[in-house]
């Protein structure tokens, strides 16, 4: 289904993105991450729209492999660290939790960007940007746009309620579980 393709595809992209901005990144992990982000970023929309598109599927597959190699050498970051408890406490699919958290964490990390956000932006945005005009918040907006185009919920509350098997989850319930997550961390 398209929803599974979107969740798995964005998860693979985030594997590469987190490896690329990791403090443990190296020239080798960067090469793997850059190729992964390019392959996935340029094909995820096509693949989610048509899982029978063999060319897009192959690019997603190879991109996912390169992303796995990249994060094996450079590690993951805050997106994955925060998404695992969200998935465990709320039954939100892993890739969806990652995708919902990515723009928030990218915005938080924007002040620490040393030019890598531009590369990531150009891999996912249909409109290229150049260094002279680029601002890190452009990446945050492009992530939100991509996620919206492939059917990812806009925020954590929406993702939690979409995943709920017992009906709507109140803001208070979400807040209480998040508080419990921070205590357990």
Which residues does each PLM region occupy?
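Carboxylate- and glycine-rich phosphate/diphosphate-binding segment that chelates Mg2+/Mn2+
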Residues: 1-74, 165-166
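Alpha-helix N-cap/helix-start motif at coil-to-helix transitions, marked by capping-box chemistry
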Residues: 4-11, 27-38, 76, 96, ...
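Short alpha-helical scaffolding segments that buttress acidic/His motifs in well-ordered protein cores
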Residues: 13-17, 60-68, 82, 102, ...
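Glycine-rich flexible loops
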Residues: 14, 20, 25, 61, ...
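Amphipathic alpha-helical interaction segments
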Residues: 31-35, 39, 59-62, 81-84, ...
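Charged/polar positions within long, soluble alpha-helices
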Residues: 45, 69-72, 76, 107, ...
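Glycine-rich phosphate/pyrophosphate-binding beta-alpha loops
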Residues: 65-98
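Gly/Pro-rich interdomain helix-loop hinge
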Residues: 86-176
